[in-house]
Amino acid sequence: VICASPAGIERGAILAMRYADAAIIVTNPEVSSVRDSDRIIGMLDSKTERAENGSRIDKHLLITRYDAGRAQRGEMLSIDDVLEILSTPLLGIIPESQDVLRASNVGAPVTLSNQLSGAGRAYAEAARRLQGESVAMTVPNQKRGLFDKLFGRRAA
């Protein structure tokens, strides 16, 4: 059973995690989101029924809305920064994508509405990893223009 809970640390999230055997922590590579995720991980390790009985919850991290270019410019945290802060096994990296917004607006999962999109593939790969398959991790790369490829920097 997969139960989605609200973002942040509110009553809904606390109720959802109380009897969890496993958790997928979904975070954006932004300081406030990672900070909330860190608090949730702490609660998973202390406030759940399993934690109170001395057992650990199987935790996975899903990083969404990742943009390598923005991370490179320091506008968001890098994947390594997020992993260092949260110390949780990485399930997948979902790239920032207009396909997700379009799919959401029509009420369809991006994995069905645009299976070839980077986000659609990344979600499908994360689901396969969650089921135990060994799937190579794809890290979304910054799209580079001709001048960037030739000179190794952003074109003005």
Mark where each language-model region is.
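Amphipathic, positively biased hydrophobic alpha-helical segments used for protein targeting
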Residues: 19, 23, 48, 98, ...
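Conserved catalytic-core segment of NTP-binding enzymes
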Residues: 5-91, 102
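Generic secondary-structure signature for well-ordered alpha-helical cores
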Residues: 46-49, 87, 96, 128-136
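Loop/turn-to-beta-strand initiation segments
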Residues: 1-2
